Amino acid sequence: MRHAFRHSVRTLGLLGLLPVLSACNSLAQMSEIGRPPRMTSITDPTLANSYRPVTMPMPPLQAPPDEAASLWRSGSKAFFKDQRASQVGDLVTIIVDITDNAAFNNGTTADRTADEKFGIPNLFGIKGKVISAITGADSLSTASSSDSGATGKITRNETVTLRLAGTITQVLPNGNFVVMGKQEVRVNSELRELGVSGIVRPQDITADNTVTHDRMAEARISYGGRGTLTQLQTPRYGQQVMDAILPF
């Protein structure tokens, strides 16, 4: 009873928010009438409300041994300066080339038939009178059959290819880099937003200062947009709410 009451209150609350959401959406659309979508300003990604520092399991830190009269600095990669990204704020080019193909085709068929018959000629001297009175015969028989079949098929084909520059926002204690990249491209009245973030090993950054997406751990890749086309392809708030609460 209490669960049903809470569900009713939640439904009424969502319905009450429909006019507010519709008004906010209308105001946002009216503010962009005759103008393309506004591009966001360049800001520090670590100052965003959604930014969270990355923490990962790390090995214990060990102090480097002192080497007297050595020409090599501890942790150096080469005698000459390495031009690859290595510090917070350095840029690195991220290459995303995703080509996924998946196909599943499953089929299940089950068929079972059972038939049993047995008689009771003498039941404690009654000689089957009880059975014959119930079934009209001196024996019992049972029969059952079941048949079921199911098929399922899934086919997916996705391709994403892009290049964008990212920034090292964090250097983890084990030396790995947290890289974040964002790019906005506006074409007519549609704004495309590209975003990539993940953890990269320094040795996976090539000599031309690039790294591929398959070398990024915990990679998060987003490709979306906003504008006239996105508004036409997105269901209205009322339709989304009704799809969420209607059971049929």
From Swiss-Prot:
GO molecular function, one term: cytoskeletal motor activity
GO biological process, one term: bacterial-type flagellum-dependent cell motility
Lipidation (N-palmitoyl cysteine): 24
Superkingdom in the source lineage: Bacteria
Entry keyword Cell membrane: no
Keywords associated with the record: Bacterial flagellum, Cell outer membrane, Lipoprotein, Membrane, Palmitate, Signal
Protein name: Flagellar L-ring protein
Lipid moiety-binding residues (S-diacylglycerol cysteine): 24
Main location per the UniProt record: membrane
Oligomer and partners: The basal body constitutes a major portion of the flagellar organelle and consists of four rings (L,P,S, and M) mounted on a central rod.
Topology of this chain in the membrane: Lipid-anchor
